[in-house]
Amino acid sequence: NLWLSKVDPELKEEILLPALLQETGKFILADLLSQEGKCETFKTKVAAGSSIEEAERELLETTTSEITAKIFRHWKLSENLINMIEHVDNVSKADDEYKKKTQILDVIKTAAYVKEPLSDENVEKALKKASIYGFDTKVLKTAITTLQDRLLDEK
């Protein structure tokens, strides 16, 4: 939210909900991994350096973002919401109309990566993606630092 208000104030409200909901499908994929007896293989792949998305795709032929979009489509939620989330794991597939929004979600997802949210490594990855997408990385870095400081103050 700190970063979005600087990147594109008009998108701030529009992206807040997808940013919070984009990992919804992870619960279903975790259950599917368990049902198929693939949990240990999944953990091994991630521990060996595969991203969660790479391991999901390899073992289940889909990713959290794709499943989340399918769930939301089934529930007949907003196409805007669905289209922002659906290609977060492969931004190049996003329609032009949703590309910037999907890129923003990708940067947020990378920085707040479920395995180690706001770790130095994930922050660097997020900054690199932001740079590739043409976003102001200084503003992003400042927003992340502010968020990290706030989280430390809560401990």
Regions found by a protein language model. Give the residues of each.
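Metal-dependent nucleotide-binding catalytic modules
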Residues: 9-10, 14-155
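Hydrophobic, well-ordered beta-alpha structural blocks that scaffold small-molecule cofactor pockets
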Residues: 1-2, 11
